[in-house]
Amino acid sequence: MAVDLLSIYGPGLFESLLTVKGATGLIAALILGYIIITRLPGQKTKPKLLDLTAGGIPFEKVGEVFNDYDKSYGKGTHGELHVQDTNKVFQLANTFYDFVTDGYEWAWGSSFHFSQRMPGLSHAASQMLHESRMASYLRLKPGMTCLDVGCGVGNPGRTVAACSGAVVTGITINKYQIQRAEYHNRRTGLVGFFKPTVGNFCNMPFDAKSFDAAFAMDATCHAPKLEDVYGEVFRVLKPGGFFATYEWVSTKNYDPTNTRHVKVMNSIIFGNGLPNIRSWKQAEEAGENVGFKLLTSFDLATAPPVGKPWYYVPELMVKYGLLKIQKALVRGACSLGLLPDQSWKVCNMVADMVPNLVEGGATDIFTPMHLLIFQKPE
């Protein structure tokens, strides 16, 4: 009953409270309450609202850097967004993760990916189940070496290491994410099992044939070309090694001449710091072009609906106005000088993208979990 009432009255209540006048009292109360609650002992060790930073970007530069980010994008023949200068793709990705890393941990958790919500499992547990499948796909055993391509703050790598016994090395272009990954390693007791490294995954600082296996989880979508990152993975894998990846791609239902489809995809591109969106077929071909043998190509989002779809939690955030609350909290904290002055723009960018992300999933024109499993020939 409570949920039903909230679903009926919640959005309207949020609308009325989040007017210019109503926002003042709401923001003040929420911030004060949040400060009190998050100072209580036993709270989870993730960034709190007033702990949010801009990664490696100085507070006074946030607005300027965001404006540069905005100007990085141009439009193609059908109005589709893309990064105009491909030489700046990695700079863009690094800037994006400076902006959003703390916010992601605060609002979503330390697993920067999507997963289906499984029956009886929490959001975090469902995320870890999604991660642990990688160990099975790659046939990992204790003592093997594995590469996490685009590791973020490292939760997938830690999960794979913990459930397989393999030693996982992660690579991310963002130095601030390395700091967070090392912190989580100490917190979880996985120092030595997950080793985060800063670097460009299209030009990795690893010797050829260094790893028994490799995986990427919602990460290679940041590469200028998939062949660039797949080629590097091919180089550092030992012959016979497996590479599994969850790819962000357009599905067979995406129509580049459909203006609504393009608008949804543009929002996903801009709100996630992507250079563009590839199709599932382009992802398959990219792996084969660099020498891999394609073993599996399957969109996990189309699996039998045992649980909730991958966009279930974002859909709830939209439905119950949680994104509006987050935007109001951040805007209020900025106006009070508690957060970088222009960081509300970053929050709005991500929050405004979420409804389009949900629509992309619900209409099956986009998936963040097209599974590809490749093998390097012996």
From Swiss-Prot:
Its EC number is 2.1.1.262. It is a single-pass membrane protein. PROSITE patterns: SAM_MT_ERG6_SMT (PS51685). One of its GO terms (molecular function) is S-adenosylmethionine-dependent methyltransferase activity. CDD domains: AdoMet_MTases. One of its GO terms (biological process) is steroid biosynthetic process. It is found in: Microsome membrane. Pfam families: Methyltransf_11 (PF08241), Sterol_MT_C (PF08498). It is an enzyme of class 2 (transferase). Keywords: Endoplasmic reticulum, Lipid biosynthesis, Lipid metabolism, Membrane, Methyltransferase, Microsome, S-adenosyl-L-methionine, Transferase, Transmembrane, Transmembrane helix. The chain crosses the membrane at residues 17-37. GO terms for cellular component: endoplasmic reticulum; membrane. It catalyses: squalene + 2 S-adenosyl-L-methionine = 3,22-dimethyl-1,2,23,24-tetradehydro-2,3,22,23-tetrahydrosqualene + 2 S-adenosyl-L-homocysteine + 2 H(+). Converts squalene to mono- and dimethyl derivatives, but not to tri- and tetramethylated products. Unable to methylate cycloartenol, zymosterol or lanosterol. Produces mainly monomethylated squalene and only 20% of dimethylated squalene. Belongs to the class I-like SAM-binding methyltransferase superfamily. Erg6/SMT family. This is Squalene methyltransferase 2. It comes from Botryococcus braunii.
